[in-house]
Amino acid sequence: MFKRTKSIIAMSVICATPKLYAQEAGRIQAGQFDLIPSFTSSMAYVDNVAYARDDDPKIYSWRATLSPELIAATEVDGNPVQVGYRLERGVYFSSDNDDYTDHFVEASGDFELNSRHRVNAVAQYEDGHEERGTGFSLGLGTAITTPDRYKSTYFGGEYMYGAATSDGLLTLKANRETLDYDRSEQAYLIRDRVKNKVGAELGYRIGSATTAVLDVTQTYVRYDNQTGIETRDSDETRVLLGVTWESTAATTGFAKVGYKEKDFESATRSTFYGTDWEVGVEWQPVSYSTFRFSTNAD
């Protein structure tokens, strides 16, 4: 299976409406809100659109991607709150069946209750797609005629205890993810699932920009439709030890390694024990946008 995408052109612009007061670059003040519009586009050549196997015929196509976004940001008692919407339209010039239109909605807030107590929360909704030959159709891209579509949600929150000047910081976290495929075939219904995760992270500063961390999480995966089949529900425990460091004011790196145990509810599936690790970087170029790049043992 082979696929290569060559990006030829990429463009990003910030838009503004003259009738509204431009408070600063990229922001438009509208009452109590700062509106932050943006637009990105790219052109790429894809030489295996459906991830066809080596002995199957392949589809070659140029692809244009257009993605407008609008973020509305404000403050509540000095705490930042924002809501955003992004649309992504992908057009394949030689394969109309693979065209897609995805929608993304997000709301988030960071609240400092006092010098030692902070809370943040985020909610996300995605009406998205999986390219043919990826996700559920991995290795079977030519067996289906259009990309698989799904709806997913994410709700998460963190509570942090510790002053900014203290050496120690305790973070309690919880989140919930759901995934529901649009298709009604049984093969898709049995993959609709909910993932609930709770955890705690203890950090202790060991340098001016370096912190040692102990990260413990428990994840519960539950599938919605399992009538007549063996259950695939599972519980997973992860214990990781590592460090985080601040490379710049806008960039934070992290590296963790440890132990993972995955216990399946089905009696015919044995419990998995093994090592686990996670490495990545978080980049926050502006206050309303954070990018996370990471890789792990999964």
Model-derived segments and their meaning:
Residues 1-8:
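Bacterial N-terminal signal peptides that target proteins for export
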